Regions:
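Noncatalytic, beta-rich nucleic-acid-contacting surfaces in large DNA/RNA-processing enzymes
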Residues: 1-6, 11, 15, 50-565
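Active-site or pore-adjacent capping/gating segments
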Residues: 1-51
Length: 565
């Protein structure tokens, strides 16, 4: 009835003229209320460590034990890197955070719930690797901790974890039992009024004919994050009706004012808040349509209030891998450990190069199959690059990458210092981490500061980029940056390298994320090559509710001479 808003004192007086004492009492209560909202302090629960330990001591013990298990021999460089990461984590106040994540991942593995090898920038952390949070060696794949946690930029850590699609909820239930239902809640998201939708909504309120409004809405190009203003520039027909029809002009102007505003609420697919006290002590809560308790604040506001979001994601491919592994053991007696298969198996890599990658994670689209046929991957590093390059923008560099791979003599480095950084990607800047390494190795930046430069480039912050160009080329003694010229790189060459970085950085991909997903891609390719029947059975079971996909995979089985019962 249009009453969902906070009324002014005058409105309340008009509505309740007979209850002046009640109105006065609300004022007295308001005067007695006092609240202080604390920003910048994390509100994570303290992790329960064994008797005789502090959280810091326990984290150290777990990490150094994991270091011994992961590496032989343990070098001084490894110890230094681990100590550096641990110190950064302690200084930023996230010791308990890592223990909490370690604990629920351990629970999942102890209960035969498959966990992904990693996701996002967390795969660049040696601490995460030694704890078993991730399964990807950051040293071997040249992944950077500062891409995940930057000591020069205070930001929340963000460890997103993939679990078996069918059993993800079991892990969330474990966390609820451990920390309490009141301290573990899911997060609200707001669906916004997008270009087409807002025109339809406004048209309905203006009581315009549905067919007419639908025609107008369909004039907006189907492009990600399209706005009405951009559509007016892109579509002359849309602009013409806007300028010539007074009623449509009013419709579109009204829609433009409402565009981007929240339209409805839903629950974040994976985000969960874990807090030290009842979450209602910090933020307002509400009940979702399925009865779940959710925050009324989005994750951005929650982070500002010091509440850490953790993402528990369900990945269908992990369910496929786990079910295939169980079938292999059931049918053949072979107990596969997918973390310790050969990740440089020539037969598996060659199978990807044939383009027969139906059912292989991230590599089964028609375009990706063609790319793999051209690329002919010879290592996991090639698969990582393939996943990173096959996106709008970086696709423009695919011919250059393939040419460099097939004809190394065509690769030209602007200076010798670039070769060790760009050699794995045949002279192309493919990863965000490479931008950071170039800035560090050529101009003497710290890795923390180099991440700030990488962020400025990816967000096209012109003023910051120009300031950093001066620092990159000429140095900045006051800020401790030597610069390229001081390191023997000519001014013209340094400027060219900086220009190239700006071009590539717009599209460069997070290598840590690509590497983790390349591992999942390789695992599915391995199972498909060596255990095709079990893999295809698990794959088809995972899409049993999608008749089109089932039919597609039946055709794949026939091509592989696998009998369908």
């Amino acid at each position: 009835g249009g009453q969902y808003y906070v009324k002014s004192p005058e409105e309340m007086e008009r509505l309740f003229p007979y209850a002046t004492e009640a109105l006065e009492n609300t004022h007295k209560i308001a005067q007695r209320c006092h609240v202080e909202i604390e920003f910048g302090v994390t509100k994570l629960p303290k992790f329960g460590v064994p008797e005789g330990y502090t959280s810091w001591e326990y984290l150290n013990e777990l990490c150094f034990k994991g270091l011994e298990e992961r590496y032989q021999p343990v070098t001084e460089e490894l110890k230094e890197r681990l100590n550096y990461e641990l110190t950064t984590i302690r200084n930023m106040g996230y010791v308990d955070y890592f223990l909490i994540v370690w604990d629920f991942i351990k629970y999942a593995r102890d209960h035969d719930i498959m966990v992904g090898p990693g996701r996002g920038s967390a795969a660049g952390s040696l601490v995460a690797y030694t704890l078993g949070i991730t399964q990807l060696d950051p040293i071997r794949y040249d992944l950077l901790f500062e891409r995940f946690l930057n000591p020069e930029r205070v930001s929340m850590p963000d460890i997103d974890v993939d679990f078996c699609f069918e059993r993800r909820q079991e892990v969330i239930d474990y966390v609820r039992r451990k920390y309490g239902d009141d301290c573990v809640v899911q997060i609200v998201t707001f669906g916004t009024l997008a270009a087409r939708g807002v025109i339809r909504d406004v048209g309905r309120v203006m009581d315009l004919p549905y067919a007419q409004v639908d025609t107008i809405a369909k004039m907006i190009p189907q492009e990600l994050n399209i706005t009405i203003d951009k559509a007016l520039q892109m579509n002359p027909e849309f602009k013409k009706v806007y300028e010539e029809d007074k009623e449509i002009h009013e419709l579109i102007d009204t829609a433009k004012r409402l565009e981007g505003l929240p339209r409805h609420t839903s629950m974040h697919a994976a985000g969960v808040v874990i807090s030290q006290k009842d979450v209602s002590e910090y933020v307002p809560l509400s009940r979702a349509s399925d009865g779940s308790i959710v925050t009324q604040f989005t994750m951005t506001t929650l982070e500002e209030l010091g509440l850490l979001k953790m993402d528990f994601l369900g990945l269908r491919t992990l369910t496929v891998i786990q079910n295939a592994v169980h079938l292999v053991e059931q049918d053949t007696g072979v107990k596969l450990d997918m973390q310790h298969i050969d990740y440089n198996d020539k037969k598996v890599l060659d199978s990807l190069g044939t383009g027969h990658s139906d059912g292989v994670f991230q590599l089964e689209s028609a375009g990706m199959k063609n790319f793999m046929k051209e690329l002919k991957p010879q290592s996991l590093e090639d698969v990582i690059a393939g996943i990173s390059l096959y996106r709008p923008g970086p696709m423009d560099f695919i011919p250059q990458y393939i040419r460099g791979k097939n004809r190394p003599d065509t690769i030209k480095y602007d200076c010798p210092q670039l070769e060790p950084i760009l050699k794995p990607t045949y002279g192309c800047i493919v990863y965000q981490e490479q931008v950071m390494q170039i800035v560090r190795n050529l101009a003497g930046y710290t890795l923390g500061r180099s991440d700030l430069v990488r962020r400025a480039m990816s967000k096209k912050k012109a003023a910051v980029m120009e300031k950093e160009r001066q620092n990159f080329v000429y140095g900045n003694e006051a800020e401790g940056v030597p610069g390229c010229i001081a390191n023997g790189i000519p001014e013209q060459t340094a400027n060219k390298i900086y220009d190239d970085m700006i071009d590539f950085a717009k599209y460069a991909f997070n290598k840590s994320h690509a590497a983790a997903y390349a591992v999942v891609s390789y695992q599915t390719a391995f199972l498909k090559y060596y255990y095709p029947v079990e893999f295809m059975a698990a794959l088809m079971t995972s899409v049993i509710e999608m008749p089109i996909k089932v039919a597609e995979y039946i055709q794949v089985c026939r091509k592989m001479n696998i009998k369908i019962l």
